[in-house]
């Protein structure tokens, strides 16, 4: 597992500034679980970092991103319907950049459908590609061609991605990504990948920053938080992590989701 830190992309920021007469606006809509909501907050943070403002209506935007969910077929159909509804807007605003990311973008048949049937979709990238968004936008602005990445899972965790949190009271804090359980009914391991745990020091630093910023309810996120720590060099499990976070002074509540009962230990229960 490789751990890297997000870096500001000066080239992308300069290209964004040059491409628009007025400061550009981005509309980001996230579907699905809390992990997707948190990913959406980080996507917004990355966009602001390279010069975009944020807006609440797609018709006001210079860039539209749908951060998608693949757990239910109905959610996928909603996304395709919403993407299809943008065709007319794209015709009115040829410079509009339309993108799709998230779990749906980690499925080959979805990427191929977008490639063949939605020629006005400009950007496609998966759940592991948030940190590459500035590079993809720069490529689109430079070459004026579609940038549709084939599904791929990166054995990497990127720290310090900028974030624009939606609440000043509640905060999401990912501690791990992916799942190794491969339940018959669930697509998560195939689109989110195998389990990857963040280093405890990085989690603690982000947690302390949230407490110091005044957040009162902090929810630890993972597809299976009970299996936190597997694969780390440091011997630590989820109960150890909870004890570590509770050493931070302050007035706050810790919540977590989601968990698998087979990984719930007596140590955690105690």
Model-assigned labels for residue ranges:
Residues 98-100, 107-109, 212-270:
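Conserved SAM/AdoMet-binding glycine-rich loop
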């Amino acid at each position: 597992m490789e751990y890297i830190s997000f870096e500001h992309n000066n080239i992308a920021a300069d290209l964004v500034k040059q491409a628009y007469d007025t400061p550009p606006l981005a509309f980001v809509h996230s579907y699905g679980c809390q992990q997707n909501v948190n990913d959406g907050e980080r996507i917004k943070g990355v966009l602001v970092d390279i010069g975009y403002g944020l807006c609440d209506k797609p018709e006001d935007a210079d860039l539209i991103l749908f951060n998608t969910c693949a757990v239910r077929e109905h959610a996928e159909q909603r996304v395709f319907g919403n993407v299809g509804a943008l065709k007319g807007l794209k015709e009115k605003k040829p410079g509009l950049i339309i993108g799709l990311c998230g779990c749906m973008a980690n499925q080959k048949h979805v990427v191929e459908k977008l490639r063949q049937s939605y020629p006005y979709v400009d950007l496609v990238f998966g759940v592991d590609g948030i940190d590459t968004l500035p590079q993809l936008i720069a490529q689109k602005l430079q070459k004026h061609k579609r940038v549709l990445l084939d599904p791929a899972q990166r054995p990497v965790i990127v720290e310090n991605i900028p974030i624009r949190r939606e609440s000043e009271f509640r905060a999401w804090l990912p501690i791990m990504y992916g799942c190794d359980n491969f339940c018959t009914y669930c697509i998560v391991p195939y689109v989110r990948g195998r389990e990857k745990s963040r280093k405890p020091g990085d989690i603690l630093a982000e947690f302390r920053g949230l407490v110091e910023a005044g957040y009162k309810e902090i929810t630890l996120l993972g597809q299976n938080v009970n299996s936190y720590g597997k694969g780390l060099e440091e011997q630590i499990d989820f109960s150890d992590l909870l004890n570590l976070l509770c050493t931070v002074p302050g007035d706050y509540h810790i919540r977590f989701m989601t968990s698998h009962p087979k990984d719930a230990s007596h140590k955690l229960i105690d």
